[in-house]
Amino acid sequence: MGILIVGAGFSGAVIAQELAQAGLSSTVIDSRSHIAGNCHTERCPETGILLHRYGPHIFHTDDAEVWAYLNALGPIMPFRNQVKATVRGAVYAMPINLHTINQFFGQTLRPAEARAFIARRCHPAHTPAVSFEDQALQMVGPELYEAFFKGYTEKQWGLSPRALPASILKRLPMRFNYDDNYFSHRFQGIPQDGYTPLVARLLDHPRITTHLNTPYRPDMAAAQDHIFWSGPLDGYFGFRLGRLGYRTLDFERFTEDGDYQGCAVMNHPDAKVPYTRVTEHKHFAPWESHAQTVCYREYARAAGPEDTPYYPIRLSAEQALLSDYQALAKAEAGVTFVGRLGTYRYLDMDVTIREALDTARHFLAQRR
């Protein structure tokens, strides 16, 4: 049985490993020169610092099986993402918490007092929020919205917050305590040696053959009984209906001596600052020690045909086009579409692994 897996990220590698353990051979191809997709990590040859080449990836989940699955691949070090934001010449904790509120407004409020204080500033929620801006004004009020969300959102999405759905902001918590952990999941960490060695272990099996620098060609399908596709959904169909919209990222890399900003992630919400954030990569591995530091300034823009896609836009125009592509995908015999690109969704790594496990198990169950 010929099985082709397109994409050597977590989706493809997990499926290949599950099939291999069940006795099925597969070929994994990837157009890039490396495995692990956008989770790829590599050592900086000049400094020895472990770099998250496509931006920071912190593993966080409440899925105990997925957490155990990841830990079986290699040591996972505890890590808490404590994001900061530089706003109008001051540094604040993100997401907004009691410290942020007290510092920003010059107060010393206790939790209940802070809730009432913010509630007085919020716009009344007479009707459900439709736009990002509506949601922000109902959730945090105009002062915090203008300072922390408006400019950042415009830079990240290239659109007015009035044109974005409220659901985007619903993913961002607001806390009335001093918890500055960006995530709230039970399990959180980063692989000691990065993500790429974990994916390499998944692909290291005699029944798995991996080819890098190998883009998919339609003529490859003839020799396969089944294809697992984790590339762009529209790309599989040759973009025949048009291209689904994505945002991409550009990174401006620079090296300094010592410690540049004292944290892994510093957001820059001010509209006058052209980049969205600065990431300092040695802080993603605090168990290591380095004399120098490597930082990335991160710029967001619309993705072109040759760019690496990061975030699906999924506005009304994309939703209509997505529905058409989903209909094509459903009718495509012998092909399973997986992963964030294959399903045109924003997926955290734990969900990616969970869905890959479930997909492989379902495929194997159907063959019995």
Model-derived segments and spans:
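Mid-domain catalytic core of redox enzymes
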Residues: 214, 218-328
